[in-house]
């Protein structure tokens, strides 16, 4: 059984990615969630509606032991299965000016977005190398490419993943493993629900926020064999802002 794992797959962009992979591929979809089991089950239901299979898998990406235990348990119960596609989507924001930022807000964002990338990817990379195939797609952000005031912690985490994407891509390319990053701009989701879209869209050349499904379309392509000559890239999907 060939599988695709989407961390933070229960809501928002992660949910849209799970659904699009179910529509476009034959992968068994592993929907990771941390605490919202109800949302994860709803995503699974919609995956099944595409005629595809999937399951939910609970762990906090920031907790290295939890990641190891959950993935080792899954692998022991699914011998012969391989996770070919990894979408590192889980992340949190704790916005505020750096001068007033509590250490907790800094470390929580770094632990989830950056250390979470390490915890999951490092645990799966050996299997991909042995299998001589893989797709790793890291969800970053315009904040990680440009830097966003009020999001120094988030910008630092995502910026580090941008650099890690480029480095790791070069390390594993000969084994037919591609590593790319997708950098969304303003996308309609829980993370942007409190933003003033009317004001902000004036900055965006296409004059609107993006949709999670548009991001999922790009991710699905990068997860496919059609993208085999693309690696180490950061692809912006932002309506032209900051271009």
Placement of each model-derived feature along the sequence:
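Alpha-helical segment proximal to the catalytic Tyr-Lys
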Residues: 126, 170-174, 228
């Amino acid at each position: 059984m060939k599988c695709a794992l989407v961390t933070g797959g229960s809501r928002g962009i992660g949910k849209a990615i799970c659904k699009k992979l179910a529509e476009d591929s034959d992968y068994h979809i592993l929907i990771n969630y941390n605490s919202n089991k109800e949302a994860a089950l709803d995503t699974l239901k919609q995956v099944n509606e595409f005629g595809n299979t999937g399951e939910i898998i609970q762990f906090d990406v920031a907790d290295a032991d939890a990641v190891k235990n959950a993935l080792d348990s899954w692998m022991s119960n699914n011998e012969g299965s391989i996770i070919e596609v990894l979408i590192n989507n889980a992340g949190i924001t704790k916005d505020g000016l750096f001068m007033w930022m509590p250490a907790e807000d800094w470390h929580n964002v770094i632990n989830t977005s950056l250390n979470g990338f390490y915890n999951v990817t490092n645990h799966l990379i050996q299997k991909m190398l042995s299998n001589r195939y893989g797709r790793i797609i890291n969800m970053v952000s315009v904040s990680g490419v440009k830097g966003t005031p009020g999001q120094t912690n988030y910008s630092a985490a995502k910026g580090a993943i941008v650099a890690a994407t480029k480095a790791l891509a070069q390390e594993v390319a000969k084994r037919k493993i591609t590593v790319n990053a997708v950098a969304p701009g303003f996308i309609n989701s829980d993370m942007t629900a409190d933003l003033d879209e009317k004001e902000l869209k004036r900055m965006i050349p296409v004059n609107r926020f993006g949709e999670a499904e548009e991001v999922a379309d790009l991710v699905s392509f990068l997860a496919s064999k059609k993208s085999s000559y693309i690696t180490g890239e950061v692809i912006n999907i932002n309506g032209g802002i900051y271009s």
